[in-house]
């Protein structure tokens, strides 16, 4: 297959986190500020302590290094302050492997210079090191792990001839990318129409298209990889050929302008209905395009599972940006998703950053981590049978005021309500206090009114998992749910109150004299006279 050099020109990007105080991020102002020489691997920390350098914003290391040395370098950068490590020059070091997760999430590292002895970059090594603008790949490198450079600001991806393996998502979400190349002598990878393809298994690793318009996945592609379109934020449509037999997790993340996905006739594994991507028998909804037009969407009754990120960004702040007219955008925006009874699993990140309201059917038994992160839901009732609330489930949901957990709940994950600012009513129907992650309610900026089953207040008060300043008080005013529900089979559940409004439709958080409109967990509403 013919090799081409792809030049992608885009507007110079101002990084979200600038370690250089406004200076040109292509220049390394801290290069070789301090040089350390070691003669034995594993001694870098001691050499640093002996040298006592006045500055370490830029560090050049000469000599043999091992993983312990690399972890020490990460430690120097970990505070992520302006006086910490920005530039790491390893060109004169002897190193064969960059460890997995090495600089992951460290905001102030801008330049890394890798040695020619390097053979492998581990998975997530530079993931979300979002100020990183330079990390050129040396000749001799053989393997790059999954998501190794995801979410960085690197400007060039020039693959060496020696490179044999690239993990999925390695180059996803590269916001400042201007250049990609594969040398003709490298037989393992090709670039076709701005798409990087791994020849060994015909996997589409990354779509580097920055412009607007349609993407036709090449006929040679058999698999679309994890995060393959991650960051292709301007494309409006994707056409999948009949050759594709598998699609990786969250393949269409952050395709903000995407309006439709089509599948070629004759594809035995996938289908598209009105621009929405499903597996062939429509039991799995894979992707609802972020900017698909329509105020509401009813998921087909055949669907049993929502894939990872199925509705992420839909109706949210990043959708419909190509529509400038406010009235037209309002007509296009997705506000409501209706999930069918029979649905059993909602994947992680399914509604992350979405702007729509959603029901959770009584048949759901599994909900993935961060499912509703930064979404606009106002209330949520988790159905009977669900045993676990995943990490970050309701984090950054600024409008969420009422959460109802079922009697079957056994575990509450980390930071489930982090960054929320609304006083929240939490109804927990579990007779025995669920086990909580030690940070279950960490970073919650308001307070919780906890309601438990009658007679169980003392049990919750004694539980270390349910103590803390976030709880205003514990009220044991809920009626116990007696049900034969299991984790695999649906059952009828007594409806409970999930929200309350006055006659003007304004949300209220306690009964008010007069007529109150009460919304129940089964979707019904009733008017209640409060005297």
What are these model-derived regions, one by one?
Residues 478-504:
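Residue-level detector of functionally pivotal "anchor" positions at catalytic/ligand-binding pockets or at interdomain
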Residues 59, 277, 460, 484-488, ...:
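Terminal processing/anchoring signals of secreted or surface-associated proteins
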Residues 31-39, 57-65, 81-97, 107-120, ...:
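Structural signature of tandem-repeat unit edges
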Residues 2, 517-531:
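C-terminal tail/sorting-segment detector
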Residues 43-52, 68-78, 99-102, 124, ...:
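Short, T/G/N/S-enriched strand-turn elements that build extracellular solenoid repeat scaffolds
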